[in-house]
Amino acid sequence: MLKRVGHPVDEKGAAVAIKDATFPVPFAPGLEFNSPVHGNWNIVHTGMLMPEARQIYVCADNCMRGVVLTAAEMNVADRFSFVIVKEENLLNGNLEDITIEGVTDVLNKLEEKPKAVLLFTVCLHHFLGCDLERVYQELEERFPKITFIRCYMDPIMQKHGPTPDQKLRKAIYEPLPKRKADEKAVSFLGSDFALEKNADLKRIVRAHQGIFRELPGCKSWEDYLAL
């Protein structure tokens, strides 16, 4: 049935007044619109803190929009790749193969291989029961010189555990090798930005002739491993 343009829309059930909102779930869980925008700081920004690493996202077009915008905004498209998952890939039940072969194709086309790959799987991998152990094992066998970091872009799962951002912040430090403690060195972890030169922590370390290390200040893979 056609409706006159400009006809008043009944928002009952579709909107909640601020005075009626309840914490922590102001809206009843249901179908939600995915806005084609990105936040001020997201998983792409955090992942780009790792030097000499490449981010690869395996997901559908809809989920790809925000991260692509971020990579373009940061001017780091040369460190960003993606594998598009289509409907037939879901129906055929071969998401593992699509992920493995897609990532392999991306890496084979690179003239210079990255030291690490932050591989982002998504909600679809959870829904379809994708064997991620097989995916990572196969990729590690094909590219033994590359460190594969397990990352997730699965916000639909965040009500049942850590958010994608929290999981990423943990994952980017997992490749660090265990080394003998250096009593003269201090590693400052978790910050998105390098501390100012005259920050209190840096001044204290310098006063004791120490070495101050932080991820945002790493320029090479060797710098990262020294953390």
Functional labels for PLM-detected ranges:
Residues 1-227:
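An N-terminal assembly and electron-transfer interface module characteristic of large anaerobic redox
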